Amino acid sequence: MDERAVLEELKKYRKMDLKYEDGAILGSMCTKPHPITKKISDMFFETNLGDPGLFRGTKKLEDEVINNIGKFLNNPNPFGYIISGGTEANITAMRAINNIAKAKRKNHKTTVIMPETAHFSFEKAREMMDLNLITPPLTKYYTMDLKYINDFIEDRNNKNDISVDGIVGIAGCTELGAIDNIKELSKIAEQNNIFLHVDAAFGGFVIPFLDDKYKLDNYCYEFDFSLNGVKSMTVDPHKMGLAPIPAGGILFRDKSFKKYLDVEAPYLTDIHQATIIGTRSGVGVASTWGVMKLFGEEGYKNLASECMDKTHYLVKEAKKLGFKPVIDPVLNIVALEDDNPEETSLKLRKMGWFISICKCVKALRIIVMPHVEKEHIDKFLGALTEVKKN
């Protein structure tokens, strides 16, 4: 095949894909990247951060990106990487917790407390590292029960039983957008010398830029490195940061945690490697750097406000039609109660609407990303009404 034939053939496959701007993708935490990232991708498409000594400029960009993200997360000296996404970031944090625990006690099964609303990546980490995961009950606000956590840790300490090595708090859970009380979790972690990881894959590029008028009294919005107990955080630029996929992020409080991640790689220009994936494109790093420079703090504040306004519009219009949200929106994520979400979701898909469902509650899940407009919301609610009538 010649070049033209190859491109024409590829176009056929691309036409099979949904496009964000059409508004039918309502269940994804990703969105159409900022247009500047096309030009940046062309510039950095051959870079490989798996061998940073060969791509020193791109590595310098990564360091700057981590520092810039650290600034709005109140961490002046962050250590971390731009990696494939939230899954790799969460597994990396669990790897750090596991290695720290093993360094203290050789024959010890690492125990981590996390909510049942935690992302599926933690289940992958459990399988990989044979972790012992403890899931406390949820409050009516779909956050972890703090009393249960305190009692569980105290009971373990009193019995000299297997200690707790890690806690995971969620800042914008995948299904509902709820935010665990990271401030209180930080206190618990500090008092008991426990590693606290915050999964802010979604919320990391929303919460710091959220106007106070959108904040609910039932949730604590303090979640970042200003809390001394927080040791690591997942935050994904390819979600609300408008970077192209793949551009996830893992940040640690400082570089002292690197030794728990490093493996030797003597045949590369840097003899140690800490990320799970070895070969890493520099496109995500450079694109994140570019979008963050373009947007700045004000740009992300405006983006968060626009998405929250549309989120509240969705809830208001849904209520008029008799659809009830599971909780008031904490972030730009809405869960609408439904007796049979699997069936409803399947019917909507046949009509061209792609939403998702929750596992912790019977509900339809809608993410109001930047590509979602009010006209899309109106059309979707019309389709949902039609489905429920039939």
Swiss-Prot record:
Alphabetically ordered keywords of this record: Decarboxylase, Lyase, Pyridoxal phosphate
Modified residues (N6-(pyridoxal phosphate)lysine): K239
GO annotation terms (biological process): carboxylic acid metabolic process; coenzyme A biosynthetic process; methanofuran biosynthetic process
SUPFAM superfamilies listed in its UniProt record: PLP-dependent transferases
Top-rank EC class of the record's enzyme: lyase
EC assignment: 4.1.1.11, 4.1.1.25
Taxonomy, superkingdom: Archaea
Reactions mediated catalytically: L-tyrosine + H(+) = tyramine + CO2; L-aspartate + H(+) = beta-alanine + CO2
Pathway(s) it belongs to: Cofactor biosynthesis; methanofuran biosynthesis; Cofactor biosynthesis; coenzyme A biosynthesis
GO MF, one example: tyrosine decarboxylase activity
Cofactor section: pyridoxal 5'-phosphate
InterPro entries assigned to the protein according to its UniProt record, in alphabetical order: GrpII_AminoAcid_Decarb, MfnA, PyrdxlP-dep_de-COase, PyrdxlP-dep_Trfase, PyrdxlP-dep_Trfase_major, PyrdxlP-dep_Trfase_small, Pyridoxal-P_BS
Family: Belongs to the group II decarboxylase family. MfnA subfamily.
PANTHER family per the UniProt record, alphabetical: PTHR42735, SPHINGOSINE-1-PHOSPHATE LYASE 1 (PTHR42735:SF6)
Function of the protein: Catalyzes the decarboxylation of L-tyrosine to produce tyramine for methanofuran biosynthesis. Can also catalyze the decarboxylation of L-aspartate to produce beta-alanine for coenzyme A (CoA) biosynthesis.
Protein known as: Probable L-tyrosine/L-aspartate decarboxylase
Organism the protein comes from: Methanococcus aeolicus (strain ATCC BAA-1280 / DSM 17508 / OCM 812 / Nankai-3)
Gene: mfnA
